[in-house]
């Protein structure tokens, strides 16, 4: 093919000018610890820091890149395009550790990708001459550097490693079809033929151990996950539970095998180190195990709730029983008939159904001298052991719904389920299969809807619609999809994806869409994806053969939501639907026209001749949708697609869409097509951030105000850049736009603020120097109070200038502005002016009729009420679907208050509007997700242990109760020896020195504590001294240390934050929290309350279970001699505890930043995030991305995009 330049001009053999700069990349946890760091990396100057971080952290090759390279001569390949290998002679001059390293420049990555594609394209005659190859290379580098487009993640991971650096490895069992001979070949190298495909669909036979069977599928899946890809399978071939086996007996059923695959997937991280494995499990709606499949995740979520609750109850009650065994002397203490305290704790345990054998076990352990039970408390964090224990957490689940089933639901008809063997036998014998069970279709529909409402799964795939648009039905039906549901084709095929950044094609002066530029990009990236099929290797023989035979591609786009906002068009409008259809048609039909051009030179795909009439029928239907043809004109469709409505589409876009449709059909009729499919709409998770997209895939924006990451660290609040352009398009003046933008993001200054402004603060005693400090912090502040804290203003100013004592401004909940006499209403007004409302609703000058242009997926800010309905999402999907070969990956967000009827309506509307697949996510439908309404309902409602004891011991004889309490806590005070052992621990908590001293009994148990903070104020020091005496008296009267630990850990007040001087504890929420963490670690072995485990401090042993706790110069009993482990030694809690995990502990909690749990989650939600924490960097900047989550800080996803 002859290539022409469009974006570049020749310049000394390089692509057109791109400004480059050196940046540092650092991703940290909330506590400041490093996740990743790279310095002086070369990147395009206009890339955001987030894009730089993701490229450096995820897509740079970290090792194996030689410092010196040399070219490998190859006949017919120009020197600039030849492969490179390590130059061993030059490398020998370097120290061994300096010979290889990692990539340090974005240009290296772009060269690796573009060079590899160009090499394979030139080698197999995709270009008419060397000049065309050079143009192709330059244009691709330019598009990557300017963020116009990006390939899927496996391309970034794998493509070009062998071509650019000579990196190789042992073959992993892959296959490829030799393009020269067309013969299947087993790979001998891991990287010579890369694995660039992200999406796979695999089949599974009803066979346990043979090739193509169940256990073989897990091996094939593992091979895919290792190289960063995702896979989907329809498991309907597997027999249902109790279905007869050929050799006698009954089948264990589909679900038993799905649980094996789920476990295998959970053990593998995709791409080696970056993401969890991603997989899709599909099941036909007539499978005999369909009900169990629908309920799978609902049931497993219930198990998580049970595990979490049960672990906490067991821990509390079993340790209470253990403690009761030490409240008196002699053998009678183990007899509940003679030890009233033991009897009471056993009764309490039995009330909450603690197993009898565990109660007996604890008493037996107490007889043997054990004094504590280590029973791990599980949490609802999605990465916790509770979720790791249950099944179904490593796949997206979808049900294949036929038109027959949907009609049965509509008409309230019965629905038959069939044993697999019976269905197959009936097909062979040419008769109607006998059902194994008959249900009401609506009952099954109710189950599907409830499960999606309760657990966000299953999604739906509309089997009949999918197959009516199938280009190759002669080779079998489409049975499944990839994990994100955008790739839908034959079993044992693969698709590699790429997405265009639509925002780059909007002229920000004229606000017109650059049709020619977009067409050019679509053409080049169709060629790239086709070349990628030629160079690829695959995880099995079948996939290699069928992917070569059908050559499916997955070109798509991102940033549609931003484009619509820039053009001043509401996402939920007829105009948006028409423009979406036009853009999709231009992309889709340009890709097919390019495919036909390649077919002219390379020949059509192998399976084309057999399927020619079907494929041309599908292309004609695509063209009819571009012309908005009436329903009677379509061929072979039961549901009429949504065509491009000419009344709402700009004429130039409509003309282009129809021209491209005409061209694709005419070229296809003449030459055939090189590819069976060409387009999908992927979620563009990580690659969307690399392209600095505001919105991913076909999604709308999630918020109007963003927090831009700064190169030097920190964040800067900005308005979504689509907003000013959208306002301009709507006719607002520059001054009106400025006012609206400032209303949203804030003025970032006190000048002009209502009530709390520069003048008012000067009258309160603020100096010009201090006001400058406040002003400098306002652009970074999310709330005005953050600018008025002691760290920003300085303690000296607060005490000397404002006359506020340290005791006052150090007190919990202290607000300087309120202390100065400003009301909460004053503060809110000033906060809205300075920091913004984060919503456009009620903005000055903005007409209410223009509100819909700026509607987002979620409510914006704390005042926002508007958000896009589920119907609007479905309508946009319906507008794009007629111009997409595959499907659209999208999860529709529903608010927490959505009801099951909404789920039913959304899934039903999706079918009626000819969407191929859909998934819904109701806010809070996962137990692991923090939810505002739950937090607000339960905030402040904590369990008072003493009140609980009082209520539990209530009876008709109050005098008797009083006697028991006196007997228990007063009559048996245990005196400490006059000379006692103990230890002194010095630490600094939040910048304040703390000395903790302990006193011990002869047996090593703690009996007293002393707390010294001698530089603090007299009142605070005296309170701490009184507190220490109170605790000491309690310890001497038999109050177990663990009770204090449970009561006071996670207690929050200042000083708090970073802890230095303690080898196990690095972060605390208060001095009291620190003290009881330290005591728990030393005397109870509770290393889960520290951030550094003992094994992290030992260099020569791994996880010794008999680790010795050390005292001040005195060795204590080994842990195992006084602590019983009911379960294996508890897994240490990670330093960054998720919000759901913190809630589950039923203690006042805070984030490492010191902000309360409720406030932190509220802030995340107000900013438009979900409230979940990122598993990679710990930030709370997670947004929903297709059916997964994506971190806006580091780019990690919980799926395959």
Curated annotation (Swiss-Prot):
GO terms for molecular function: cobalamin binding; cobalt ion binding; nucleotide binding; ribonucleoside-diphosphate reductase activity, thioredoxin disulfide as acceptor. Substrate binds at residues 153, 198-199, 230, 482-486, 683-687. It catalyses: a 2'-deoxyribonucleoside 5'-diphosphate + [thioredoxin]-disulfide + H2O = a ribonucleoside 5'-diphosphate + [thioredoxin]-dithiol. It comes from the Bacteria. The active site is at residues 482, 484, 486. 5'-deoxyadenosylcobalamine (coenzyme B12). Residues 1100-1118 have a biased composition (Basic and acidic residues). Pfam families: Ribonuc_red_2_N, Ribonuc_red_lgC, TSCPD. Residues 1100-1120 are annotated as: Disordered. The keyword Oxidoreductase applies. Keywords: Cobalamin, Cobalt, Disulfide bond, DNA synthesis, Nucleotide-binding, Oxidoreductase. Its cofactor is adenosylcob(III)alamin. One of its GO terms (biological process) is DNA biosynthetic process. Disulfide bonds join 199-495. InterPro entries: RdRp_reductase_class-2, RNR_2_N, RNR_lg_C, RNR_NrdJ/NrdZ, TSCPD_dom, YebC-like. Its EC number is 1.17.4.1. Belongs to the ribonucleoside diphosphate reductase class-2 family. Catalyzes the reduction of ribonucleotides to deoxyribonucleotides. May function to provide a pool of deoxyribonucleotide precursors for DNA repair during oxygen limitation and/or for immediate growth after restoration of oxygen. This is Vitamin B12-dependent ribonucleotide reductase. It comes from Leptospira interrogans serogroup Icterohaemorrhagiae serovar Lai (strain 56601). The gene is nrdJ.
